[in-house]
Amino acid sequence: MIFCRLDLYFFPILDIYTPIDRTILGYKELFSPIRRFSMKKAAVIHDLSGFGKCSLTAAIPVLSALGVQCCPVATAVLTGQTGYPCYHCTDLTAMLPDYIDAWGKNNAHFDAIYSGFLTGAKQISQVLDFIRQFREEHTLLLVDPVMGDDGNAYPFFTPGLLNGMKELTLKADVITPNLTEACLLADIPEDALLHCRTNTDLLKLAEDVALRLQKKASHPQDVVITGVKCRDEKHPVIYNIAATANGIYRHESPFFDRSFSGTGDLFASVLCGCCTKGICTEDAILLAGKFLSHSIGDTMKENTPGRDGVNFEKFLIDLIADSNV
């Protein structure tokens, strides 16, 4: 990496954007390589939380770093994610029809649509309408079906939400449920997790569920089950299980025995950005795993409360470099 001085500011320049002669660049020459590629756009349907480094506050910087314009559709505004002892939430369901209508009148087009936290069945219906209106032949649809974790459904979960999520995920090109959400989508009892006596049992359940969900879709779909925790005393790891057109495989990352806000949103955002750029799902999972491992490891050193999220910002530069190799 070298640094170029523009007036009184110093900008780090990755080797991939630096001319062979490594000369000091002017503004025009510095940014001209980036303009060779048309900017991709992703509509991100998610909540906006003031604290917690999750949802849109995770998606916007990650997609921007990956060279994808993030066009937010806020489903709710929260003072902080729901893990805080005190928070206020404003549901934006009533606003969404006018918001989406304005985008339609402005002839908006998207290379990707990424759906995350939705407040209920009515919002899912609105998202399905959004997809019908804006999805084109080339548009990637990624759905993160937020419903629960660690064997338990979230407080806002309802049967109507589950039925809507089933319909929504069937339309997606990529889905990123955790194992609890995957079991809900596949109609496997939540307590199935409790019957897994060994890590082998847990991984087999995750792989079986991934394949079952993949077969439900009427088109090629990549199912990525995130955050499968294997707490082996000698070698604790966390797996992301992927069922793709190339088969099923496991990606292993270091296991940190703490839970942090926003890690699933960061993972899904990296997948969305990478896949929108044409990177295959398997490689995108590797990049997301590396990015999260570094971010969580750094956060652990500072003893940051889990509800505050992870220190991902300082590792965006590495994500940029890795995604352009």
Q: PLM features: residue spans?
A:
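Phosphate-handling active-site elements
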Residues: 69, 248-249, 274-288
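Short, small-residue alpha-helix embedded
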Residues: 258-281
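Conserved phosphate/ATP/ADP-binding segment of small-molecule kinases
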Residues: 156-248, 279
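Short pre-catalytic strand/loop immediately N-terminal to key active-site residues, enriched for Gly-Thr
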Residues: 50-51, 249-262
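Conserved N-terminal subdomain of the carbohydrate kinase-like
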Residues: 40-155, 309-324
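Short, Lys/Arg-enriched N-terminal segments with co-localized hydrophobic residues
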Residues: 15-38
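Charged C-terminal helix
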Residues: 282-325
